[in-house]
Every structure is written in C-alpha cells, then in structure tokens.
From Swiss-Prot:
Protein family membership: Belongs to the DNA polymerase type-Y family.
Cofactor comment text: Binds 2 magnesium ions per subunit.
One term of GO molecular function: magnesium ion binding
Known catalytic reactions: DNA(n) + a 2'-deoxyribonucleoside 5'-triphosphate = DNA(n+1) + diphosphate
InterPro entries (UniProt xref): DNA/RNA_pol_sf, DNA_pol_Y-fam_lit_finger_sf, DNA_pol_Y-fam_little_finger, DNA_polymerase-Y, DNApol_IV, PolY_HhH_motif, Rev_trsase/Diguanyl_cyclase, UmuC
EC numbers for this chain: 2.7.7.7
Record GO cellular component, one term: plasma membrane
SUPFAM superfamilies for this protein: DNA/RNA polymerases (SSF56672), Lesion bypass DNA polymerase (Y-family), little finger domain (SSF100879)
Protein name: DNA polymerase IV 1
Role: Poorly processive, error-prone DNA polymerase involved in untargeted mutagenesis. Copies undamaged DNA at stalled replication forks, which arise in vivo from mismatched or misaligned primer ends. These misaligned primers can be extended by PolIV. Exhibits no 3'-5' exonuclease (proofreading) activity. May be involved in translesional synthesis, in conjunction with the beta clamp from PolIII.
Site location (Substrate discrimination): F15
Keyword DNA damage: yes
Chain positions recorded as Mg(2+) binding sites: D10, D105
Amino acid sequence: MESRWVLHLDMDAFFASVEQLTRPTLRGRPVLVGGLGGRGVVAGASYEARAYGARSAMPMHQARRLIGVTAVVLPPRGVVYGIASRRVFDTVRGLVPVVEQLSFDEAFAEPPQLAGAVAEDVETFCERLRRRVRDETGLIASVGAGSGKQIAKIASGLAKPDGIRVVRHAEEQALLSGLPVRRLWGIGPVAEEKLHRLGIETIGQLAALSDAEAANILGATIGPALHRLARGIDDRPVVERAEAKQISAESTFAVDLTTMEQLHEAIDSIAEHAHQRLLRDGRGARTITVKLKKSDMSTLTRSATMPYPTTDAGALFTVARRLLPDPLQIGPIRLLGVGFSGLSDIRQESLFADSDLTQETAAAHYVETPGAVVPAAHDATMWRVGDDVAHPELGHGWVQGAGHGVVTVRFETRGSGPGSARTFPVDTGDISNASPLDSLDWPDYIGQLSVEGSAGASAPTVDDVGDR
C-alpha cells in the first residue's frame, strides 16, 4: 500500500492533435502549427511530424525542410485550443475535485480516492480518466503517477504517446538516478551547464551530493530544493493556480544593440517565445508592452492597448515592432523584453484583426508612442491557408490552399469525418469567414460556456528567453 499518489495528465501533441481532430483529413499527416513567416517558430508538431525530427520551438523553416513537401503547416488557432483545453479539464474535474492546471495541455491532480491505494488501483483510475477524456473530447492524453509532482511528470513523459506509467514508490529512486540531470524539474540550461562542468550528468549524481555542495553549486535557495527532488523527496501540494496577469519574455545581449535592424531581428524571436506562452495560457491579450534597458542601466517601457483581446501573432508582433525606438536616438540597448497583458478569455477571434485595429485606432490607448500606427487593413479577398470559412450549402470548412486566382476549401469538422475539397475563384461570394469554434462541432458545450461567461484556468507565464 502506498500513501500518496499524484497524477500528471499531459495531452499528446495538443495543438496539432486539435487540428487533426477538427480537420479530419489531417489525421495521420505530419502537421506543424506555428508562425508562417520567415522567422516563424513551431508551436506544436504532430507525432507524424516528430518522426521526421520536427519539434516545438524549432524554426519553422527547419521543420519544413526535415519533413519535405508532405508537411502541413497551419497558423495557431488559440480560441479553438482554449475551448478544447477547457473541455478536457472540465472532464478531469468531474473525477478529481482539485486540478492544478499548468497550461493548455497539462495538469496535476491528487485524487482523494487514491490515498493509500495500491499501484494496480491507480492504473485502473488512470485508464478510466484517459478514457473519459477521449470519449468527451476525442483527444488523447498520457498519464503518469507517483508519490509527488516530480515523479508524476517524469512518468507521463515516459508514458507518451497515448499511455499510462505508474511508478511504485519503491521504484522511484532507481528511476530517477539514471535520468539526465536536465530532466529534473527546475534544472535549466544554465544550471545544467554548471553541473556538467563538475561531471554531474545524472540525477543520481546530484542526489549523491551533500546539501552544502548542492547549495554551493546551484545557490542557497534553489540548490537544497533541487537536491531534495533529486533524492525523491517531493511533498509539494496540488493546488488550483491563480491566473497570471501578464505573459512576458526578455533577453539580455552579450553585445549592445545599436541599430533598428538588430532590434527588429531580436524582437521577433523574443515575441515568438512570449506568444507561445500566450497560446498555452489560453487567453487573448489586449496590451503589448516593450521593455528596453539601455547601456546606462536606465529602463524604458512603451505599450499599446488594442480594442479587443487576441492571440493573433501578426497583430501582436506588428504592434510590438512599431513600439521600438531608434537606438540612434536613445542609445545602445542591452536588454529587450515583450509583454502581453490585459488577458481575458476569447470566444471568437476577430475575423478581420488588422482591419479592426485600423478602424478603431481612436479606442486604443498608447503610452510613450506619439504618432504610433497600427497594422494595415486586411483584404478580405486574400484567403490564408488555415482560415475557417462557411458555405451556405456545404457548411463549415477551412482554406487548404490559395493562389493563382483560386482558393481551395476542405469542408469538414470534428463530427463530419474527412470532407471533400472544392475550388472557388478567390473573389467568390459563396464562402465567408466563419468562427473557428464551429470546427469543434460542440454547439451545446460552447453555448453553455457563453451562458456561464466563465474563464478557464491558466498557467504562470513569466519567461526569460535569456536563460533558454
């Protein structure tokens, strides 16, 4: 009999899996979700794409090169992922009263009914939980279980894809000891490098240190905590998390930035990191803030507030770039950060995001940006791959391809099965922009959310790009 069981539920390839769920033709295809521009980054990759070596946070051009012409590249649909995530964890909460949600796609739980249970009973419960999520949403989860959060999270990683891994308490130390030290929660690239320089490659080697040695290497605060985790001591409680007020990312440069070209190149990468966290959080942002620390250590911040919350990368990044001052006027820049705030649930992304920005400039509040402008208006006849559309007879669909005066639409949703493709003139009046949520085909569930006016849980979202 074991005393405590913590579960870690992790949705498998969540962003790409939601795309394959709502666009059935993509099932079994190598799907990449992320930025489509030259500096785009992969936010999510299906397991079919991962088989080629593609992964999250990889430059999109590199992932496409690895996969070749069979790659399906789609822009993120944050509003769809948010509702899918909400339904997943509503389902989990039907079996477990307290869920500590870390992001869109993962959470801890400590079911009270498993206190003192044997491993076989835990396996049965985990399978019941996975089956309930799959039946309710059509999405696949992996579940790990152990005596604490650390072991549970490692176990869910070992269970992927589409599996369960229950680690008995007597097995935990043996499992931990042989793993790379980077697998320990809280060990980032900087700490990993410090440990490697001292010949400490595994969690077992870290556990063999004394408390004093761990504190000396990793710091007086974090060192002892990581040392305890390495020894399998993890009594952290599972608790509901409060919503973060801001999502941010920043980087300190070894050499100061002195030109607008350097600033533009740097902010694209930093904003991409912050945007990935925004997508995982599940809410949209209204306010974009750019933070700059000059070579004299003084700090300058500039911000702009849009009329509505959004997860649209194009709108957010364009505003961030336009907030940048010229280093020739203010001096060299040693640190640059991007923050998204004014976070709230989005039930529907604006169908003409850039146009809304242009038309509602008077409603936007700008700080320290006299004369700032917003993105140019969107041309409604220029369809993008991944756009959700509707046809009066064929129903809901998505743009599969566009160019040379025509647009190809695949008409399908989660409940339809693989659909047929139709080609139209690009200026056709037969198709119109549609809500991405219609692709989920959950009218009753989404309608109930609208009635409740409730918000989903979210994860803490502070990110330091400089330590990645």
